[in-house]
């Protein structure tokens, strides 16, 4: 199996779009650190949950998120909790990536975003990013170089799609179970 560095098969950029709103900027939906950290995928049915903020036109052009992109958290208070990822499953109008995160746009002829997201959740990647995070004590970060150096298995696209679909299906079932558990917990508190 062939492995290639992520930076060879994807475009990577680190966002600096903050949560503040300014009158002279355009309204956007912000995909924040917490959105990336907590979700396997960002879908159009989550639009109402995303924060509304503003951004400059050049920030919108640079950090707009599109179907197939993958986002990761690049900062954390602990090394073992860095580089969490999410997949952008749908095109969502005015969706922009917030700060403390990096956008990874796979080269579609080589790499599936869904597959990349699943790969970024593996223990191999978790450990790689933990060992390559810089900082001390209270804040750790992944540099653009550290993010791009991860070796990614390059399988035929159809094989990537099959593997990603199985893992996405499992994740959807986990999400349903979480919602059921949350509802049961809320019901128990009311009773």
Feature-to-residue mapping (PLM):
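Non-catalytic DNA-recognition/assembly elements of restriction-modification systems
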Residues: 1-17, 149-191
